[in-house]
Curated annotation (Swiss-Prot):
Receptor for lysophosphatidic acid (LPA). Plays a role in the reorganization of the actin cytoskeleton, cell migration, differentiation and proliferation, and thereby contributes to the responses to tissue damage and infectious agents. Activates downstream signaling cascades via the G(i)/G(o), G(12)/G(13), and G(q) families of heteromeric G proteins. Signaling inhibits adenylyl cyclase activity and decreases cellular cAMP levels. Signaling triggers an increase of cytoplasmic Ca(2+) levels. This is Lysophosphatidic acid receptor 1-B. The chain crosses the membrane at residues 53-77, 86-109, 124-146, 166-186, 207-227, 258-282, 297-317. It comes from Xenopus laevis. Expressed at high levels in oocytes and at lower levels in brain and spinal cord. Below detection level in lung, heart, kidney, liver, muscle, stomach, and intestine. Glycans are attached at N29, N37. Pfam families: 7tm_1 (PF00001). A 1-acyl-sn-glycero-3-phosphate binds at K41, R126, Q127, G128, L129, I130, D131, W212. InterPro entries: GPCR_Rhodpsn, GPCR_Rhodpsn_7TM, LPA_rcpt, LPA_rcpt_EDG2. Coiled coil: none annotated. One of its GO terms (biological process) is positive regulation of Rho protein signal transduction.
Length: 366
C-alpha cells in the first residue's frame, strides 16, 4: 500500500524533473520573433521613417566604405613604393573594412521588418559577419600601432619584418576575427538559456557580450599606451634636438604633426567605438536603462570607423593621395610603375614625421 508521503513526493519529483528539463531546453526551432518578444526588444512590422532613414544612410556609408577601401588596396598593389610591411598591414586593414562594408550591406537588407524572415542560423550569421569584420578592423589597428612602435624605437623608416612574417600576422588577425565572430554560432549563445539573453542582441548571451566588449576595450587601452609611449619618446627627442640644433621650428612642427596624427587616430576610435561599447555594458549591467532607443544610431557610428580608416591612415600620405588621383583618372606614371629617386621621402607621413625628429637629433648630438 502506497503511503501518503510517497503519494505526495511523487508529483513533487515529477515537477522537479519537468523544471530541470525546461531549464535545459533549447529553442533552435523558434522564430526570431519569439526571442525578440521575450527580451522585450520591439520588432518592426513595417518600415517607419526612422528605419528608412537608418537603412538609407547605412547603405550609402556601406558603398563608400567598399569603394574607399578598394581604392586603398589597389593603390598599394600598383605602387611599388608601398611594398613595405606597414603598407601591407594598411592593405589588410582596408580589406577588413571592405569586409565590414559587405557585412553592413547584408545587415541593411536584413534589418527592420525583414528581421522576421530570418531563422536562428541566418540571424547568427548576420551578427557573426559584423563581429568578424569589426574584430578584424580593431586587430589591424592594433597591429599597425605595434609596427609603428617597433619602427620608431629602432629608428627605421620601415621595419625589417619579412613578407612571411607579415603574412603570419595577417593570418593571425583573420583567425582571431573569425573565431570571435563564430563563437556565438557554435554555442556561446542564450538559445538554451533564455534567462541570460541580451536585450540588444536577443540571441546573444550576456556573458559573451561582456567578453567581446572587454576584448575591444583592452585592445583600445593597448593602442593608447603604445601611441602615448611613441609620443613621449619623440617629444623627449625633439626637446633634446632643440637644445643642440638651430631648427627649433622644425622640431616643434615635427612634434605637433605627430600629436595631430595620434589625436586623429585615437579620437576617431573613441568617437566611433566608445558609445557602442558602453551601450553593450549597460545592456548587461543596467536592465532598466532605455538603451534600445539609441542602438541603431550607435551602430551607424561604429560603422563610420571603417569609412574613416582609409582617410586617416592613407589619405594623409601625399604619395597615396597622388596614387588615388592616378587610378581615378586612369593615368599611369613612373611613380606607380616602380621606385624612383627620392621614393623614401614619399613614404608614410607618419614615418617621415617621427624619423625626421629622431635622426636629426642623433646627428646633432653626435
Amino acid at each position: 500500500m502506497t503511503s501518503l508521503s510517497e503519494f505526495v513526493s511523487e508529483p513533487i519529483g515529477m515537477m522537479s524533473q519537468t523544471s530541470a528539463a525546461s531549464e535545459s531546453q533549447c529553442y533552435y526551432n523558434e522564430t526570431i520573433a519569439f526571442f525578440y518578444n521575450r527580451s522585450g526588444k520591439y520588432l518592426d512590422t513595417e518600415w517607419n521613417a526612422v528605419s528608412k532613414l537608418v537603412m538609407g544612410l547605412g547603405i550609402t556609408v556601406c558603398i563608400f566604405i567598399m569603394l574607399a577601401n578598394l581604392l586603398v588596396m589597389v593603390a598599394i598593389y600598383v605602387n611599388r613604393r608601398f611594398h613595405f610591411p606597414i603598407y601591407y598591414l594598411m592593405a589588410n586593414l582596408a580589406a577588413a573594412d571592405f569586409f565590414a562594408g559587405l557585412a553592413y550591406f547584408y545587415l541593411m537588407f536584413n534589418t527592420g521588418p525583414n528581421t522576421r524572415r530570418l531563422t536562428v542560423s541566418t540571424w547568427l550569421l548576420r551578427q557573426g559577419l559584423i563581429d568578424t569584420s569589426l574584430t578584424a578592423s580593431v586587430a589591424n589597428l592594433l597591429a599597425i600601432a605595434i609596427e609603428r612602435h617597433i619602427t620608431v624605437f629602432r629608428m627605421q623608416l620601415h621595419t625589417r619584418m619579412s613578407n612571411r612574417r607579415v603574412v603570419v600576422v595577417i593570418v593571425v588577425i583573420w583567425t582571431v576575427a573569425i573565431v570571435m565572430g563564430a563563437i556565438p554560432s557554435v554555442g556561446w549563445n542564450c538559445i538554451c538559456d533564455l534567462e541570460h539573453c541580451s536585450n540588444m542582441a536577443p540571441l546573444y548571451s550576456d556573458s559573451y557580450l561582456i567578453f567581446w566588449t572587454i576584448f575591444n576595450l583592452v585592445t583600445f587601452v593597448v593602442m593608447v599606451v603604445l601611441y602615448a609611449h611613441i609620443f613621449v619618446y619623440v617629444r623627449q627627442r625633439t626637446m633634446r634636438m632643440s637644445r643642440h640644433s638651430s631648427g627649433p621650428r622644425r622640431n616643434r612642427d615635427t612634434m605637433m604633426s605627430l600629436l595631430k596624427t595620434v589625436v586623429i587616430v585615437l579620437g576617431a576610435f573613441i568617437v566611433c567605438w566608445t558609445p557602442g561599447l558602453v551601450l553593450l555594458l549597460l545592456d548587461v549591467c543596467c536592465p532598466q536603462c532605455n538603451i534600445l532607443a539609441y542602438e541603431k544610431f550607435f551602430l551607424l557610428l561604429a560603422e563610420f570607423n571603417s569609412a574613416m580608416n582609409p582617410i586617416i591612415y592613407s589619405y594623409r600620405d601625399k604619395e597615396m593621395s597622388a596614387t588615388f588621383k592616378q587610378i581615378l583618372c586612369c593615368q599611369r606614371t613612373e611613380n606607380v610603375n616602380g621606385p624612383t629617386e627620392g621614393s623614401d621621402r614619399s613614404a608614410s607621413s607618419l614615418n617621415h614625421t617621427i624619423l625626421a625628429g629622431v635622426h636629426s637629433n642623433d646627428h646633432s648630438v653626435v
